[in-house]
Amino acid sequence: ELIEVGAGAISMITIAPELPGAIEAIKYLSAAGIKVAIGHTDGNFTDAAAGTNAGASIVTHFMNAMSKEKIEGSISSFVLVDERLSVELILDGHHVPFNTASEIVQAIGDRIVLVTDAMAAAGSVDGNYTIGKLAVTVQNSVARLQSNGALAGSTLTMDKAFVNAINECGVSIEQAVSMCSTNPAKALGVKDRGSIEVGMRADLLSYNSTS
């Protein structure tokens, strides 16, 4: 019903592969041309493999809302070795420490898709906000749930993620552009943007050393 009502508007859905019916759903959605991401999951290595084999091709904000290390192996260990997966990363230094992010980028940089996971306070000021019915406090640009202090989205913007990739993870400008633009377009199957070529959309931003 969602696919029919969406009429092509649904481009990606995140699914926890260990849930009942998840593998069948991944197969169905993939066959319908919808990108499926693995995320918000308590699964393990085997669950991630099953989801990927069923058609999942993206990992939602890697290292966040994911299972910890388990005897059976973690999802993170699968993600790092399976080249079929594009890997989202929130590069704000809070969701993933910059030193850890640097190691991830060095290991799988050509598969990294930078995302913001931004909430209403992005580009705004510290204070109290809501995400749905959840009360959130933003302090020093870090958004946390008032109920338990857990991270609640981010205030990161993509231009800052770009700068962080260069300054904190040591990547080249070309690599940062790929992680912010080319890789996301490739992951979503978008053909008309993501690189500078004849026939592509001319969505260009200018940066310099003071940006």
Predicted regions: what is each one?
Residues 2-124:
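Active-site core of metal-dependent hydrolases
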Residues 74-89, 93, 105-207:
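His/Asp/Glu-enriched, well-ordered alpha-helical/loop segment
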